A protein has these predicted regions:
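Generic beta-strand structural signal
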Residues: 81, 191-192, 249
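Conserved N-proximal alpha/beta basic substrate-recognition cap immediately N-terminal to
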Residues: 6-118
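Phosphate-binding site of ATP-dependent enzymes
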Residues: 148-234, 238
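Active-site nucleotide/adenylate-binding loops and adjacent lid/helix of ATP-dependent enzymes
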Residues: 3-8, 86-184, 225
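A short acidic/glycine-rich loop-to-helix N-cap element
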Residues: 268-274
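A short beta-strand motif that forms the metal-chelation/ATP-contact edge
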Residues: 189-191, 253-268
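A long amphipathic alpha-helix within ATP-dependent nucleotide-binding catalytic cores
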Residues: 208-257, 279-291
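Protein kinase-like catalytic core scaffold
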Residues: 139, 197-198, 243, 256-258
Length: 291
């Protein structure tokens, strides 16, 4: 069996995933080759898709380029994860919409209106009054697309809100209720092949964001029934093959969904939990390809 790993040009944390998938794949008789998405892997030519990749049984897609993902799927490559799931997770607002009306607790959330005019006028700021009225301060403003805590802001007053909005108004945004009980801490639940495999808690004493990319510390966390129940709702709703689900802690440690990561890093998870994530992932891939 042979497969392909695709990453974007900034390999970063994916270097560990490439190494571990290759190690565990070799043990299972799976050969992996790595390609960087530099814009040259596929195109539409003479009205048809042309892919400049070798034949492969599957692709481990560690990029968020939905266009390439959809092109590869249309060319009959099997992607882990599917393009639709990557898109649904990468867009935080789509994640919230998908989870609404499903018994999954989330922060109160408002989608920012898209802005196209060349000049920002006073009338374009009026909706911020309804954001303030609905959420109150402090509140959280997020870029819809982002990872490792980048583009997430804790906003304490109207002046900060207007300033941050002016800086970011030409990209999709969302505004959320601030969960004070979860300051600097969150829970990452890892899911493989539709099953919860473990969890670890992250701490950051210097910032309201707990993301490991912001130098948080972590420890293994024994999941209780409340978190497992919500995690399983997410598994069923999204038909999850692989994901890291991040929860905030509400009152009495109530699980509140923060986001779902389709390309979740797992280096820290393996170190903290001693769970062989790469092995479980490659076993899933092998089983699904042979089904």
């Amino acid at each position: 069996m042979n497969g392909i790993i695709i990453t974007n040009q900034d390999i970063g944390h994916n270097a560990y995933k490439i190494k571990r998938f290759t190690e565990e794949g070799n043990k299972l008789g799976i050969s992996l080759s790595h390609y960087i998405n530099d814009g040259s892997l596929a195109l539409i030519k003479d009205n048809n898709i042309e892919v400049k990749l070798p034949k492969a049984d599957f692709i481990i897609y560690l990029d968020k380029d939905i266009y390439l993902a959809r092109i590869l799927e249309k060319a009959n490559y099997r992607l882990f994860n599917h393009a639709d799931f990557i898109k649904m997770c990468d867009d935080k607002m789509l994640t919230n919409i998908m989870c609404a009306n499903s018994g999954i607790k989330m922060p109160k959330t408002i989608a920012g209106p898209l802005f196209y005019s060349p000049k920002l006028e006073e009338k374009n700021l009026k909706f911020l009054d309804s954001v303030i009225s609905e959420l109150e301060f402090p509140l959280v403003m997020k870029k819809v697309y982002g990872s490792l805590g980048l583009g997430v802001y804790l906003v304490n007053n109207k002046e900060e809100l207007i300033s941050l909005y002016k800086e970011n108004c030409r990209q999709p945004l969302q505004f959320q209720e601030y969960i004070a009980t979860s300051f600097g801490k969150s829970l990452r639940v890892l899911i493989i092949d539709g099953k919860v495999v473990g969890a670890f808690q992250r701490y950051n004493t210097e910032d309201f964001r707990s993301n490991f990319g912001l130098t948080a510390t972590s420890k293994e966390y024994p999941l209780n029934d409340k978190f497992l129940e919500v995690a399983n709702k997410i598994i069923n709703l999204f038909n999850v093959e692989y994901a890291g689900v991040d929860f905030l802690f509400g009152e009495n440690n109530e699980p509140i969904l923060c986001e779902i990561n389709s390309n979740a890093f797992f280096e820290e998870f393996e170190k903290v939990t001693n769970i062989n994530v790469a092995r479980l992932f490659m076993e899933m891939v092998k089983r699904k390809i042979y089904e």
